[in-house]
Amino acid sequence: MIVNECLFFTIALCDAAEPWQLGFQDAATPMMQGIIDLHHDILFFLILILVFVLWILVRALWHFYYKKNPIPQRIVHGTTIEILWTIFPSIILMFIAIPSFALLYSMDEVVVDPAMTLKAIGHQWYWTYEYSDYNSSDEQSLTFDSYMIPEDDLELGQLRLLEVDNRVVVPVKTNLRLIVTSADVLHSWAVPSLGVKCDAVPGRLNQISMLVQREGVYYGQCSEICGTNHAFMPIVIEAVSATDYTNWVSNLFIPPTS
């Protein structure tokens, strides 16, 4: 393929799953960056709520311990505190909801005039890719299947259960339209670094938009249980410069010489 990524480079950028990983993979699209930012914003409010609740709990245990207060206080009504614990949670939910809805709607937006259209078809248990812009005839089409490389055939530096024989090559900083469907059962096309997860449903076309911002190799997997070999349907996206992408396409259409 065009870019030969070593294992160190892939792990350093965190574009593939790692053992014992707890955080996100590095964002390669505005969509994924928005997801990470939203997570951090919500986590800020969660930490504040956690600290406040723990403070109230510790204070109650300390000041209202039964040995210090043998006779419990009988508080049955408090208008002020009831108003406060209704208003403040509502404000917090509003601060969480507004950016989350904005991100949700932006993820559903479809580019009106994409520079490139890619179709992914799920099978048991591999993916078929069609570059629709080049499929002008049966003699000239850009379609291929992508299977997982068996463990015994892996080369040094390749990732177990994540490498494929044919990678999907896309240009960076280009508006892409991805059409996802299935030829048999439910699948799901998901690449964490790109912030993409689209269900592949038989008889239905789902589409999403992508804008890969940096070159690299991005790994994903089928994220919908689809049978015995569900875990062996990896996805590999190789993002290259526009020049390298054009050369890659041109080389595929060069007729073989005898």
From Swiss-Prot:
GO terms for molecular function: copper ion binding; cytochrome-c oxidase activity. The keyword Mitochondrion applies. Keywords: Copper, Electron transport, Magnesium, Membrane, Metal-binding, Mitochondrion, Mitochondrion inner membrane, Respiratory chain, Translocase, Transmembrane, Transmembrane helix, Transport. Its EC number is 7.1.1.9. Cu cation A2 binds at residues 222, 224, 226, 230. SUPFAM superfamilies: Cupredoxins, Cytochrome c oxidase subunit II-like, transmembrane region. Component of the cytochrome c oxidase (complex IV, CIV), a multisubunit enzyme composed of a catalytic core of 3 subunits and several supernumerary subunits. The complex exists as a monomer or a dimer and forms supercomplexes (SCs) in the inner mitochondrial membrane with ubiquinol-cytochrome c oxidoreductase (cytochrome b-c1 complex, complex III, CIII). This is Cytochrome c oxidase subunit 2. The chain crosses the membrane at residues 42-58, 83-104. It catalyses: 4 Fe(II)-[cytochrome c] + O2 + 8 H(+)(in) = 4 Fe(III)-[cytochrome c] + 2 H2O + 4 H(+)(out). Mg(2+) binds at residue 224. The gene is COX2.
